[in-house]
Swiss-Prot record:
The gene is idi. This is Isopentenyl-diphosphate Delta-isomerase. It is found in: Cytoplasm. Belongs to the IPP isomerase type 1 family. One of its GO terms (biological process) is isoprenoid biosynthetic process. It comes from Escherichia coli O7:K1 (strain IAI39 / ExPEC). It catalyses: isopentenyl diphosphate = dimethylallyl diphosphate. Its EC number is 5.3.3.2. Binds 1 Mg(2+) ion per subunit. The magnesium ion binds only when substrate is bound. One of its GO terms (molecular function) is isopentenyl-diphosphate delta-isomerase activity.
Amino acid sequence: MQTEHVILLNAQGVPTGTLEKYAAHTADTLLHLAFSSWLFNAKGQLLVTRRALSKKAWPGVWTNSVCGHPQLGESNEDAVIRRCRFELGVEITAPEPVYPDFRYRATDPNGIVENEVCPVFAARTTSALQINDDEVMDYQWCDLADVLHGIDATPWAFSPWMVMQATNREARKRLSAFTQLK
């Protein structure tokens, strides 16, 4: 895969340039564009993933299915599709926005800062997973209600962005729609 970049943003969310992804995530991370995606299977279960230990930010932490950064000229939806193929080896339905105006800043235990405008999407797959071990060290298909209960009871056990997304009432409602079988 070619070197990925992040799209830098000003305080109003307007693009101002790009920076190599690995260089972007530091103790002084600039605001940039990202996305977060929650993936559901044909049984209506959510894919929860554990980030690989080699990840720069939040290694080994349980999180929602896929996160990443759109590249210059790439739509958020196309970026979700690309990262689902790369990290999970799956094809997905068209990603649907569930929390389009999500924005957050969080610092991991190693001092790495995430500072992102991060629209949240949900999608479905019927493909068998082909996990990229450089990205994901473990995974589990779970009932959304169980995951949400776990987040409410033990938020420290999940990535901060997943917790923030899951505790938004409207996002929960939209995610719950993906548990309904089609």
